[in-house]
Amino acid sequence: MKTIHLNSCESITKLPDLYCPNLEKLHLSDFKNLNKVHESFGFLEKLKEWNLYDCSQLQILPSTLMLKSLRFFRLPGCSRLEKFPDIHPEMKCLNHLSLNRCGFRELPSSLLYLTGLASLYLSDNSKLTNFLVGANKSQLREEEDIPSAKLRLASNSFNNFSWPTGFLCLTWLDLKGSPIIEVELDSWLQPDYFPVLTRLDLYNTGIVTIPESISRFTTLRQLFLTNCKKLREIPRLPQSIRTVDAMNCDWLDRQSSSRLLNQVSLSFSFSLKFKL
């Protein structure tokens, strides 16, 4: 069996130990009473896609993921899921990680092993205040060549917030509605940390200013700031930018607005509404 695709199975509360060594796709959605996934699902070497959509009672995943072939892992709407599994160093193929609307309070430092990650979605995680908990290069396997294992540790005043300097393949970072964005952006929003970032979603967050470092993101093309009610200042943006959405940023100052308007070109999509 290579594919399992099931919807709305309310009678299932646990995924038991299944012998499916050839499983490549596992799609489960709207399992309202699913609470636990057996450890064996963390060791399916041929699994490429794993989706757990809106499993609102899910609380327990395998403690460790060693899914060497996994490329897509999606957990949107798993609102009671508070602990994310540790990542094995051999999980280098994961390209897309969607953790929208989950219950995570923190994410482990082993995410640094996901060196092929291109898209990371953390939107609407209202409880997420610590990212890469315990992040310390000495905690990672020293024999591994991990580009993302260089760390930038912020001060303790930011709730032990830390960020890696090497999500070297990440092109899309989605943090909309997330409280972790309330730490000072300039402590982690640096081009060396995300050298190929093309899209940054910060809308509906409590940010006040965008750091000057944004101008050095030479690959950034899209910036979304809608409903950032506290946002007051946006510096000059990189020449690569093509889309800015700053609708309903009620306190954005006139200088920022004028600066953005001066950057507008024929290939520049721009939405702006600011307080007069």
What is each of the regions a protein language model found here?
Residues 1-158, 164-184, 188-276:
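Predominantly recognizes leucine-rich repeat
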